[in-house]
Amino acid sequence: LLPLSTAHAGVSVQYDSTRSFIPNSAKGGTILIDKHRSRMDVGTNASVIFDGNAQSMEIISHDDKTYTVLDKASAEAISAELEPALQQMRTQLQALPPEQREMMEKMMAERMGINLQGAAEQEPDLDLKKTDKSGESGGIACNWWQATDDTVLRYEYCVTPAKSVPYGDDLLKYFHDLKQFKREIVGTINRSGALQIPSLPIADVREIEGLPPISRQYQDGKLILETRFVSVTETDLPAATFNLPEGYSEQKLPGVAR
């Protein structure tokens, strides 16, 4: 009898990420991809397992030995559970003087990520424009695109054709699925005003017609985050790569019953 295989081939993306407003914030990480599934390890403390077909994300804390599931059902449950309480808080704030009300709204937004001013608008469609500048990361040459909102720079992507990147088709699928998750699942939560999940520099690979070995995010005209591919290689993926660790317990989001 042939031995059962405990691993199969997948794609490994090594990347570096730097937050410009935090000194010495450069961090390396790994994304493992197998068709519609992916796993990103963030240092040794956390992992994120994503299923593009199911549009489901499992956020794992190795320190606490817990995980949280974020999908369409949980996003809708969060909005439904928190909205009545938020509406009551908004009503109470209306009785405050304007300056005090503004101060409270700002404090809740900054400290708790709660939008008391009402439901957030869906992230606007951005204007994408190819520039004449070029770049390189991990030995991959690319050309810069800019994404602006009413002339305000939001993102920059250094783009290369998928065929120029090893396993480019797998990466195209990954980026497309992740962009859909951001738009539909994260968008559901943000539009409710219940919680505000920070925007992520995820390119729409269909619009830029390629892959971004370098992604940059801007806020108020200043660079706040840059992510670069260091390498893209084939790797053996153990059968348990996309499984939740044994012994970890689920930490449910507000309003979510499983």
Regions found by a protein language model. Give the residues of each.
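Extended soluble regions of mature proteins
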Residues: 9-258
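C-terminal segment of classical bacterial N-terminal signal peptides
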Residues: 1-8
